Amino acid sequence: MSNRKYFGTDGIRGRVGDAPITPDFVLKLGWAAGKVLARHGSRKIIIGKDTRISGYMLESALEAGLAAAGLSALFTGPMPTPAVAYLTRTFRAEAGIVISASHNPFYDNGIKFFSIDGTKLPDAVEEAIEAEMEKEISCVDSAELGKASRIVDAAGRYIEFCKATFPNELSLSELKIVVDCANGATYHIAPNVLRELGANVIAIGCEPNGVNINAEVGATDVRALQARVLAEKADLGIAFDGDGDRVIMVDHEGNKVDGDQSMYIIAREGLRQGQLRGGAVGTLMSNMGLELALKQLGIPFARAKVGDRYVLEKMQEKGWRIGAENSGHVILLDKTTTGDGIVAGLQVLAAMARNHMSLHDLCSGMKMFPQILVNVRYTAGSGDPLEHESVKAVTAEVEAALGNRGRVLLRKSGTEPLIRVMVEGEDEAQVTEFAHRIADAVKAV
């Protein structure tokens, strides 16, 4: 069990100006990371960021810390998280660092690391960095200080990588696509990828100003995208989150297509093409309709804990190549090393182009079960509501009523005193009533 002080499951994250996302902390983090990573040989670190205004401050602090430890920084400027993973691999850099808080508001930010092979840093390396942070900063000799430079063609390199994951024999020339880049890191990447593959592209959420990232746009709020798809009579819409590792789509009727549905389309197409190896990994929150649809195709399905980190771990454990969260993280290990919204979106588009089918029709083989989520706040320190007999009794009653055509999932939030009550089944009215019945039991504790 890890007892890390700063690193969570997705790096270090928080509100800018509050510990730990402060200039002095991030400078020391850069120094500590530099001290640990310098032991491994290479002296280059890739640094990318999303479009938050605080990214300028934090990349400068990181660079100063790395330089003091004798490592050189290569800046990409605003760049999707998966692009930093890719560039870290191709530059043979010792590590990649992403400054982003993903789908969070602009006033949050975070730092996460990739290893030389474009995967998450091992826990042992993160723990070594934390241990180094307990020491006083010491500067290497002046002749050994790190330098800083910019990768001027970073965007072009990543655009070509993305295009290479789309089959050469196919084209997007028959598609009108609305793309929503969340005023985030994909704003100068995704529209160009789609246009160069032949699509007629209408771009929204592509005017970042430092404070509008994820603000009523992007994968976490597709209302603007849905409206624009309908207004433009487009074939579909594609939305990314602030750092480009999630993708949510919208069909020509304005219906939202989530990560579960995208994985279903990609897995089914892989099966048809004889390219699917093993099964598919979802999470505890994956829709039961996904599990049943994959079962009908004979594709094995396994659930991991919520979090793309745990999806990847389960994929590696089973030797499978595809995994996803319903929030839009889709991991395709035959294509890349981490969740990549653009690459995942391209595989769905390839299925559309190859089969001459609409996104709506590709989704039709999977019946989504109504899934009701209720958040219940409880008093921290007052005991665990999930262990209370009354909550257990009501949960058991609901599970018995649903039988094998539904699910109940109760879990604590990892960041605040909330119990998340999820009930899933075939009848939306019944599922809603069941979810509120359990939520009321939790509130009464």
From Swiss-Prot:
| EC nos | 5.4.2.10
As cofactor, the record names: Mg(2+)
Q: How is it modified after translation?
A: Activated by phosphorylation.
Q: Which residues carry this modification: Phosphoserine?
A: 102
Quote the record's binding site residues for Mg(2+). 102, 241, 243, 245
What this protein catalyses is:
alpha-D-glucosamine 1-phosphate = D-glucosamine 6-phosphate
Does the keyword section mention Protease?
no
What keywords does the record list, in alphabetical order? Isomerase, Magnesium, Metal-binding, Phosphoprotein
The entry's free-text remark on the cofactor is: Binds 1 Mg(2+) ion per subunit.
Residues annotated as the enzyme's active site: 102 (phosphoserine intermediate)
- Report a single Gene Ontology molecular function: phosphomannomutase activity
Q: Show the Pfam families listed in the entry.
A: PGM_PMM_I, PGM_PMM_II, PGM_PMM_III, PGM_PMM_IV
Enzyme class comes to isomerase
Q: Which HAMAP family match?
A: GlmM_B
Q: Family, per the entry?
A: Belongs to the phosphohexose mutase family.
Question: What does this chain do?
Answer: Catalyzes the conversion of glucosamine-6-phosphate to glucosamine-1-phosphate.
| Name by which UniProt lists this protein | Phosphoglucosamine mutase
Q: Which organism is it from?
A: Shigella flexneri serotype 5b (strain 8401)
